[in-house]
Curated annotation (Swiss-Prot):
NCBIfam families in the record: psbD
Native species: Chloranthus spicatus (Chulantree)
The enzyme's E.C. designation: 1.10.3.9
Keywords: Acetylation, Chlorophyll, Chloroplast, Chromophore, Electron transport, Iron, Magnesium, Membrane, Metal-binding, Oxidoreductase, Phosphoprotein, Photosynthesis, Photosystem II, Plastid, Thylakoid, Transmembrane, Transmembrane helix, Transport
Identification of the protein by name: Photosystem II D2 protein
Amino acid sequence: MTITLGRFTKEENDLFDIMDDWLRRDRFVFVGWSGLLLFPCAYFALGGWFTGTTFVTSWYTHGLASSYLEGCNFLTAAVSTPANSLAHSLLLLWGPEAQGDFTRWCQLGGLWTFVALHGAFGLIGFMLRQFELARSVQLRPYNAIAFSAPIAVFVSVFLIYPLGQSGWFFAPSFGVAAIFRFILFFQGFHNWTLNPFHMMGVAGVLGAALLCAIHGATVENTLFEDGDGANTFRAFNPTQAEETYSMVTANRFWSQIFGVAFSNKRWLHFFMLFVPVTGLWMSALGVVGLALNLRAYDFVSQEIRAAEDPEFETFYTKNILLNEGIRAWMAAQDQPHENLIFPEEVLPRGNAL
């Protein structure tokens, strides 16, 4: 048997090699293969949002003004969801609804699906960008894994939830006040604050904020190579190469405060990664459950007793009444196409009224 040692050579004009060389070249803004997905999608998502909030009305879909042109400001402008009658249509510009008419497409809510889908793929492109760069400089991919958490929340809230409901209409519109309205909707119709997945999400986000504050303060407190500056910001060089804080001192401090403390940096930083990422993933799973109309905790015995005994009321039963009020008052405002009219006598009132 003959073994030939040599180097396999490709054609010098191989298109893939030419593209790979150009895309992954060291430049001020890295492009990469992921950039082919990230940059166009981010451009179209942001461009669609700025266009919608500046010029496009929601009169035909929600009966609302939603653009700067109509008098909204940054907090009240939004790119609104399509009308409920359009269900889960992709609302393509050339589709049967708009038939290539850009003005009609905007009036029907086509910009929302445009922004939502390009936004989702743009976020995925950003995560792939982190994978690609980590691989290029031989880092672990934990940044990309961490970024999967906000992607999961975005996809579950803006895409999976409305897919489980009757249409895109019930997704959040892209605007500040619009998101607030959606939060009230989630509470009134799903009792979201009493959902265990929401509780885990809150614990993750607030816990991560606490960990971040503690960690930053501890590192600042245990610097042992300070300069002679008058304050913390002048007292050390932010570009120095070596670590100049004492893990041992930090460990002794927190051992005295709590009785326990992290003894190595890997476990400490993994915990800071784990807490927020797990919290956001749990929130995303909870929203997937809401897409299927899964219920939060129900304490029916308290509801029955409150209905029978005017003197018995808990914070839970008060919240249930508040949710009923949100549903009754909000449904007529939020779904004008249904022509819902609730007589005064069916609107909920607490035991105190």
